[in-house]
């Protein structure tokens, strides 16, 4: 058996300073230790954990994920369209519930236990195994092989059997309870939400456009690390700015905020602006809670709300019944505003970039129909996008792309 200390020391010795995850009892010991050391980010779901780790990785840090294989389905989206597509190396420790003998585990683990290896193989994801009989030397050997995959820009899974790693003293252990209490001790948002119920309908009726807003705030974005959600938002941001330093997401819908959070937590001196959409934000609304709990003061979250999935044909979302500003305030954001003019957005963003976050700015906009702009990948590769954003974080210029 590998002790908690040996497991965490092995990660630290190899430079891993960011671990996000969703708990499994197989990893209860390391999670308790990593939480105590201030290295662990408790994510709302496994996909968000991977997206946050990807953000930290692009920011130049070695990042890992801890999860149970029952959550592999949640990982598939960012695994297939973020880390694989952009060549982002993340180390994923995943427990092997329901394997090798499903009858020795709970019934809900049977299907995934038998399918885990096959699913990873189908996605061409490299994976290694830490058996129940593993020693610290065995772990070192596995990590040596994993490092080779990471060096090639690939996300790699380390599948971990029951009993391989020492468990925590108990679910209610003093360390875990103390860490949890500290995490919730901070006051929630400062009561600055401005949930103007009529703002959305007014802005949509008056035709406030996302492109209009992007043009108005373009000069402010030049001083920030910008992450834009998939769909028309990324197309229009690239079309308006032409910047090769923003991170344009194509895929991994709903995970822009988690990716930006990973960047913000590891680059506290850099303002991080996430340009999100209502449909994407709704898809992983739990990430707002993670942002509020971590409370990075350099994090600004802008949600363009047009009440639709515009790039897939304008199908309606449920944002009409969701008051994002109120949700964000309840989740612990320092401020949340609804802005229904380009001038108001500009003023709010300028203030938010001064720090004291996390801040949410909701921008009700009209549906624009088909976008007049091409995807960023019409001019750059996904590698160019990753490297351009990483160079921005290092304070350098990147000349990649056409």
Locations of regions flagged by a protein language model:
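Long, charge-dense
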Residues: 307-314
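Active-site regions of oxyanion-processing enzymes, predominantly non-cytosolic
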Residues: 155-159, 358-363
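Residue-level marker for buried hydrophobic side chains located in beta-strands
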Residues: 226, 272-275, 302
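A short, acidic, amphipathic alpha-helical segment used as a generic capping/interface helix at domain edges
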Residues: 147, 341-354
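Thiamine diphosphate
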Residues: 1-121, 125-152, 156-259, 265-266, ...
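Active-site flanking residues adjacent to catalytic metal/cofactor-binding acidic residues
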Residues: 160, 275-278, 304, 363
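A short alpha/beta connector and helix-capping loop motif
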Residues: 80, 284-305
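DG-centered beta-turn motif at the end of beta-strands
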Residues: 270-281, 286-288
């Amino acid at each position: 058996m590998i002790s908690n200390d040996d497991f965490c020391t092995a990660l630290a010795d190899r430079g891993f300073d960011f671990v996000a995850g969703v708990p499994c009892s197989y990893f209860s010991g390391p999670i308790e230790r990593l939480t105590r050391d201030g290295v662990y980010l408790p994510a709302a779901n496994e996909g968000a954990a991977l997206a946050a780790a990807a953000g930290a990785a692009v920011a130049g840090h070695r990042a890992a994920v801890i999860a149970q294989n029952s959550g592999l389905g949640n990982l598939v989206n960012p695994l297939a369209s973020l880390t694989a597509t952009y060549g982002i190396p993340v180390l994923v420790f995943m427990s092997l519930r329901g394997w090798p003998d499903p009858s020795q585990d709970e019934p809900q683990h049977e299907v995934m236990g038998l399918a885990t290896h096959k699913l990873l193989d189908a996605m061409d994801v490299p994976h290694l195994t830490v058996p129940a009989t593993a020693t610290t030397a065995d772990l070192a050997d596995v990590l040596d092989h994993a490092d080779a995959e990471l060096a090639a820009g690939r996300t790699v899974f380390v599948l971990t059997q029951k009993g391989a790693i020492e468990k925590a003293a108990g679910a209610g252990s003093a360390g875990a309870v103390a860490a949890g209490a500290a995490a919730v001790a901070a006051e929630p948002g400062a009561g600055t939400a401005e949930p103007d119920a009529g703002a959305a309908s007014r802005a949509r009726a008056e035709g406030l456009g996302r492109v209009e807003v992007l043009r108005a705030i373009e000069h402010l974005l030049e001083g920030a690390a910008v992450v834009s959600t998939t769909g028309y938002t990324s197309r229009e941001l690239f079309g308006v700015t032409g910047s090769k330093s923003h991170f344009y997401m194509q895929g991994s819908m709903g995970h822009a905020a988690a990716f930006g959070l990973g960047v913000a937590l590891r680059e506290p001196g850099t303002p991080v602006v996430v340009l999100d959409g209502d449909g994407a934000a709704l898809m992983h609304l739990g990430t707002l809670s993670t942002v509020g709990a971590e409370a990075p003061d350099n994090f600004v979250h802008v949600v363009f709300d047009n009440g639709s999935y515009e790039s897939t044909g304008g199908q309606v979302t449920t944002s009409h019944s969701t008051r994002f500003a109120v949700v964000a305030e309840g989740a612990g954001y320092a401020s949340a505003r609804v802005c229904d003019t380009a001038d108001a957005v500009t003023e709010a963003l300028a203030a938010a970039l001064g720090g004291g976050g996390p801040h949410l700015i909701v921008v009700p906009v009209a549906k624009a129909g088909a976008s007049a702009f091409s995807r960023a990948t019409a001019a750059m590769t996904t590698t160019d996008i990753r490297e351009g954003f990483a160079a921005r974080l290092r304070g350098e210029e990147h000349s990649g792309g056409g």
